[in-house]
Amino acid sequence: MKSDIEIAQSVPLKPITEIVKKVGIDGDDLELYGNYKAKLSFEKIKSVKGNKPGKLILVTAINPTPAGEGKSTMSIGLADALTKIGKKTMLALREPSLGPVMGIKGGAAGGGYAQVLPMEDINLHFTGDMHAITTAHNALSALIDNHLQQGNELGIDPRRIIWKRVLDLNDRSLRQVIVGLGSPVNGVPREDGFDITVASEVMAILCLATDLKDLKARLANIVIAYRYDKSPVYVRDLKVEGALALILKDAIKPNLVQTIYGTPAFVHGGPFANIAHGCNSVLATSTALRLADYTVTEAGFGADLGAEKFLNIKTPNLPKAPDAVVIVATLRALKMHGGVAKADLTFENTAAVRSGFANLKRHVENIRKFNIPVVVAINEFVTDTKAEIQVLKELCAEIAVPVELASVWAKGADGGIALANAVVSAIAEESAAYKRLYADKDSLEEKLRAIVTEIYGGRAVQFGPKAKNQLKQFAQFGWDQLPVCMAKTQYSFSDDPSLLGAPDQFDITIRELVPKTGAGFIVALTGDVMTMPGLPKTPAAMKMDVTEDGTAVGLF
């Protein structure tokens, strides 16, 4: 079998102007970035706003193994399979962060014969959105430090600035830094730090904004610091939201590319799901819904993180809720949740599949709490045995959830036809009646308790000393009406990554709350979740290269 990049480079690309005709987009509606990438114009986005939205399919997963469960690959393969069975389909995915591409992942545009193309461009600089977001974010940092230097008219306490700088790389050495050193002309010395760009509130705002006006309003509402009297300071107090929106005026436009099979795909925005809300842009998803009969989108990591945030944070900003949710599972992950060591996952173990099924079962039950039909997709691997597959199918039948094998990595669209038909049938047979997990009027404590007990299966939520004080403070500022965004390990329902399966006798401890008032949610930090990742001992970058003719090598 060829590598992902070898497969991607072997596929003859069609001009993007030809690809998008399938969903009623003309060449004049595009802002081209070469022949195979484009941004969609605001004029086209506005012109389809009155269209009735099509069906929305959300792809999520069980709690993943370190290698991931193939959610993006499955999303692409499902979209291609829907196209193959005659459905007018679009795909709406997140764009990769360069940090993990250079770090552990090596690439994030699908895999095998289920990829979005041009894969190398998407994984690297693409259309420059990440750079624009990084620039806007750091421009705000520079403007804050300049305000301190120029007299600090707003009375900002330099010790209480909560706006860090960002970089789209994994660089642990920048987590905590001191700025303003050297001499009085170099600024006011203070502690600072760097997050990865995909953890930036600017990224979250770009992905939740519905247009430029909304983008500017959300940027204005960012909390950047506290004064000496502990009152919050907003971007609007600095009067720079217009400048930030100007930097982002092109980045907010959704990017269009194609799959190997020729399905039109929006790839736009990329917040992480363990430290942010983990969904692609509202603009991309909403526009796809109004252009296609079926839109396939995904939410990061497992359903306890990405799907929960999609349904509680993103869905209220969309024209409709998902009509079906596909939960991707692998037998290797189920066996790991059933207690099998990583080194032994290739050996048949039906008992471990039965034990690990508790993890999948809880995810199915959780999605059903939102009143949305569920389909399970088994992402097939060559090490899967007939006995293991049969056990999993029997277990799914016991909880009355449709389940289909999918081999889109190896077979592309052909490997996802059974899954596509199952999803279409689920939508036709059972109408979604979306119900949110909590109400806006619920307190932050009530919202967090609902997520911990209803979604994670935990016993209770505990608050550290800092978080306890913040609960009172945020209520005084009126921020308790916002939804919550949990920053938690993706490997477990709990905040302990080693607690696999479906644990229940555990508490989740919230150590700190972070206001993201521009994005419109409050981040709750648990465990040791880092907002600036580090590189592994052997980074994927060590295998990457470029030939003399400019061909990328080693992007998996």
From Swiss-Prot:
The organism sits in which domain of life? Bacteria
Q: In which pathway does it act?
A: One-carbon metabolism; tetrahydrofolate interconversion
Instruction: Write down the top EC class of this protein.
Output: ligase
Q: Which GO molecular function annotation, any one, does this entry have? A: formate-tetrahydrofolate ligase activity
Q: Does the keyword ATP-binding apply?
A: yes
The question of whether Nucleotide-binding is a record keyword is answered with yes
- Family matches, as InterPro entries: Formate_THF_ligase (IPR000559), Formate_THF_ligase_CS (IPR020628), P-loop_NTPase (IPR027417)
Q: Which UniProt keywords apply?
A: ATP-binding, Ligase, Nucleotide-binding, One-carbon metabolism
The EC number on file is 6.3.4.3
- Give the UniProt record's GO annotations in the biological process aspect: tetrahydrofolate interconversion
Per UniProt, ATP binds at: 65-72
Disulfide pairs here are none
Known catalytic reactions: (6S)-5,6,7,8-tetrahydrofolate + formate + ATP = (6R)-10-formyltetrahydrofolate + ADP + phosphate
Region forming the signal peptide: none
- Family membership noted in the UniProt record: Belongs to the formate--tetrahydrofolate ligase family.
Q: Which NCBIfam families match?
A: PRK13505.1 (NF010030)
Q: What is this protein called?
A: Formate--tetrahydrofolate ligase
Protein species of origin: Streptococcus equi subsp. zooepidemicus (strain H70)
Classification of source organism: Bacteria, Bacillati, Bacillota, Bacilli, Lactobacillales
